[in-house]
Regions:
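Conserved Rossmann-fold NAD(P)-dependent oxidoreductase catalytic core, especially the SDR/UDP-sugar
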Residues: 131-177
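Non-catalytic terminal and boundary segments that flank Rossmann-like NAD(P)-dependent oxidoreductase
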Residues: 1-31, 352
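N-terminal Rossmann NAD(P)H-binding glycine-rich loop of SDR-like oxidoreductase domains
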Residues: 30-50
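Active-site helix of classical SDR
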Residues: 179, 183
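C-terminal substrate-binding subdomain of Rossmann-fold SDR/epimerase-dehydratase oxidoreductases
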Residues: 1-4, 230-358
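NAD(P)H-binding glycine-rich loop region in Rossmannoid oxidoreductase-like domains
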Residues: 87-125
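NAD(P)-dependent short-chain dehydrogenase/reductase
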Residues: 157-166, 189-246, 251-262, 287-292
């Protein structure tokens, strides 16, 4: 069972052992989590289940999923005491009779191509789902609500600028791909409105691109493709020049950050969530990963916008506010990564190891 062995188990143990998470606040509580089968949601639910077992917290976890059988398959092999499935989606959230103490809203459209091909659905899913969940939070008088937003709400900051939560953004409503970031911004404003008008304790997590164990092998995002290339011993093929620069985030660090925000955050506040030490360009990341895996990098430049890719951006997130909640990235012990410590390659090494466990 993964909870007793392997890289994912290591992550769960490290999260559970994190003392700056006030676990006592979760004792006997009920949590509703949307997006529970997604990468971040899955890691969070798994960590909560592990902590439930190891710390005897007696939590109840309500996981809103579209397909119960798929969800059961995703969590197969785990001890799922306390986990209950609620079948529905963001456009049709079923009635929930149980009391709810905390909500983590992670369900969202995530495929870049869908932002362009299905922009109406992208906006509807974001706004209606968030609105209905905030109404539920108000009704249940929850103790905390975390909305998972995105670094994309900042638009295109200038190169060399450290992006803070107070920064304004510039997004074009005439760009169809803005369906995703503007949808996120709209939901953020709705969260702040509920906090102001109704006193709902809502916090916002603006996450950078996140990866680690638990990534589906056929995930289409660039980090998963790089990992597959290493495992399959084939060259990395970049379809852009790879000029975009950003920081990244490990899945276990994301889950720990969400718990810190939920239990220690300030209502109405947004928090950048990233590992600042991983900041680099996509091209640089490709070269590092290729060197680690003994493969090469080739270029096959294509129309970026047609495929839903972001234009070149420089997203260097400042995580000072999150660190004020005592959060810090987990220090792993990966060895022999180009004979030097490197957080980004450490994340890749653990993700690739984790692919063997699924």
């Amino acid at each position: 069972m993964w909870t007793d062995d392997g890289v994912f188990a290591e992550d769960m143990k490290q999260i559970c052992a994190t003392e700056w998470i006030p676990w006592e606040k979760l004792e006997g509580k009920t949590l509703l989590i949307t997006g529970a089968t997604g990468l971040i949601g899955y890691t969070l639910v798994s960590a909560l289940l592990y902590a439930n077992r190891e710390r005897g917290l007696h939590m109840t976890i309500l996981a809103l999923v579209r397909d119960e059988e798929r969800a059961k398959a995703r969590f197969a092999g785990q001890e799922t005491d306390g986990l209950h499935w609620i079948v529905g989606d963001m456009l049709n959230i079923p009635t929930i009779e149980q009391s709810i103490d905390y909500i983590v809203h992670g369900a969202s459209q995530t495929g870049s191509k869908a932002f362009v091909r299905e922009p109406v659905e992208t906006i509807k899913i974001a706004f209606k789902g968030t609105c209905d969940l905030l109404e539920l939070a108000k009704e249940k008088r929850v103790l905390g609500f975390v909305y998972l937003s995105s670094m994309e709400v900042y638009g295109y900051p200038p190169k060399g600028h450290k992006v803070k939560e107070s920064d304004s953004c510039c997004l074009s409503p005439l760009d169809v791909r803005s369906s995703y970031p503007i949808g996120k911004l709209q939901c953020e404003n709705l969260c702040c409105a509920y906090a102001s008008e109704y006193g709902v304790p809502v916090m916002i997590a603006r996450l950078t691109q996140t990866f680690g164990p638990g990534v589906n092998y056929d995930d289409t995002r660039v980090f998963a493709e790089f990992a597959r290339c290493v495992k399959e011993k084939r060259d990395i093929v970049l379809k852009t020049k790879g000029e975009t620069e950003r920081s990244y985030l490990y899945t276990a660090d994301a889950a720990a950050a969400l718990l810190a925000i939920m239990l220690k955050g300030q209502p109405g506040q947004a928090y950048n969530v990233a590992d600042e030490s991983t900041y680099c360009s996509i091209a640089e990341m490709a070269q590092r990963v290729a060197q680690m895996g003994g493969i090469d990098v080739r270029y096959d430049i294509q129309d970026e916008r047609k495929n839903g890719y972001l234009a070149v951006l420089f997203m260097n997130l400042d995580t000072s506010l999150l660190k004020e909640l005592d959060w810090e990235p987990i220090k792993h012990t990966e060895k022999n990564i180009l004979d030097r410590p490197n957080a980004l390659l450490d994340m890749y090494s653990r993700m690739i190891r984790g692919m063997n466990e699924w």
